Regions:
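Generic structural signal for secondary-structure transition and capping sites
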Residues: 24, 36, 66, 99-102, ...
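Amphipathic alpha-helical dimerization/coiled-coil segments
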Residues: 85-120
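Basic amphipathic alpha-helical segments that dock to polyanions
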Residues: 54, 58-61
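A cross-family signal for key residues in well-ordered alpha-helices
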Residues: 17, 26-29, 68, 92, ...
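Generic recognition of well-ordered alpha-helical segments
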Residues: 14, 44, 56, 92, ...
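Non-catalytic interaction surface on structured domains
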Residues: 14, 43-45, 69, 105-115
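N-terminal helix-turn-helix DNA-binding core of bacterial DNA-binding proteins
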Residues: 2, 6-53, 80
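Beta-hairpin "wing" of winged helix-turn-helix
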Residues: 62-82
Length: 120
């Protein structure tokens, strides 16, 4: 198994790329706020994600064993999403990233403005 993050075939690189996409961490964090959520509730909680992207993100998280999709045999059908133990083991790391972002956001925003102002 390749464990060199610079190698495009490295599984660690692939996992980090999937988690580092635009929506995965936000969806995981949102699902962590409650025991389970229906698709529509999740979509309302993350209003700027499209229906298609939420579907793709949930499928990817399910493939990676981070989200469980439960279909209830009812009419109309009811589907709920919840985090797995693997996702819960990731939460402290997500929370640490959020804390780091809060701690550094003002200086990062300041630096972005400086950089944007210096571009020609």
């Amino acid at each position: 198994m390749i464990l060199d993050a610079y190698d495009p075939q490295c599984p660690i690189r692939n996992i980090l790329a999937r988690l580092g996409d635009k929506w995965s961490l936000l969806v995981i964090y949102t699902l962590s706020q409650t025991e389970r959520m229906r698709f529509g509730d999740l979509r309302r909680a993350v209003p700027d994600i499209s229906q298609k992207m939420l579907t793709v993100t949930l499928r990817t998280l399910e493939e990676d064993g981070l989200v469980t999709r439960t279909v209830y045999p009812e009419i109309p059908p009811r589907v709920e999403y919840s985090l797995t133990a693997r996702a819960f083991s990731l939460l402290p790391h997500i929370q640490a990233l959020v804390a780091w972002a809060k701690e550094n956001m003002e200086s990062i925003i300041r630096d972005r403005k400086k950089t944007a102002g210096s571009k020609h």
